[in-house]
């Protein structure tokens, strides 16, 4: 088995990360994870098909992960999910009330960490607003991944 790879495209909003990645997709950059794309898709369908990302992802583990998370609205903290989603094998049906950027970001976080465990190559983008993204790359290296960090900025 070849060495798994992670490609992180970092940069501010509007810098062109998604545009660059679209050019790279045909060049075997692994599964592409993008919270913005996922949020749009969830708002249209209210459904997440985990097999779209990989057959080895476990829907019940994702639900456990999501139900342990909260989101902040000003000074208020509330659960990420207002109700448990309906799960049928790899397909998860969310309440339209719960679908927002926080939910999409947490789903992508879950998939990223599962891919580390499963040693699956992938590419993702981030505004890199927290040092945990660098820690994630370090953790990936410790697990045998070859890591790439591309910083995209506009002038």
What are these regions (language model features)?
Residues 16:
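Conserved glycine(s) of the Walker
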Residues 6-8:
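Short hydrophobic/aromatic beta-strand immediately N-terminal to the Walker A/P-loop
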Residues 24-117:
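Conserved substrate/cofactor phosphate-moiety recognition/catalytic segment
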Residues 23-26, 137-146:
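Short, surface-exposed basic-aromatic patches at helix termini and helix-loop junctions that form
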Residues 125-126, 141-155:
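Conserved phosphate-donor/acceptor-positioning beta-strand/loop module used by diverse small-molecule
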Residues 1-4, 115-116:
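Phosphate-binding P-loop
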Residues 20:
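Hydrophobic positions on the alpha1 helix immediately C-terminal to the Walker A/P-loop
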Residues 12-13:
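The conserved Walker
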């Amino acid at each position: 088995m070849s060495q798994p790879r992670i490609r992180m495209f970092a940069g501010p909003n509007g810098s062109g990360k998604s545009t660059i990645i679209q050019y790279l997709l045909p060049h075997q950059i692994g599964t592409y994870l993008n919270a913005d794309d996922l949020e749009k898709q969830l708002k249209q369908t209210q459904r997440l098909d985990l097999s779209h990302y990989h057959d080895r992802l476990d829907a019940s583990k994702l639900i456990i992960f999501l139900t342990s998370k909260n989101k902040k609205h000003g000074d208020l903290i509330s659960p990420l999910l207002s109700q448990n989603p309906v799960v049928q094998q790899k397909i998860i049906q969310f309440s339209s009330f719960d679908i927002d950027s926080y939910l999409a970001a947490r789903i992508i976080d879950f998939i990223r960490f599962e891919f580390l465990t499963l040693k699956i190559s992938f590419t993702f983008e981030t505004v890199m607003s927290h040092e945990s993204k660098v820690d994630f790359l370090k953790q990936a290296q410790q697990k045998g991944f070859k890591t790439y960090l591309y910083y995209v900025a506009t002038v």
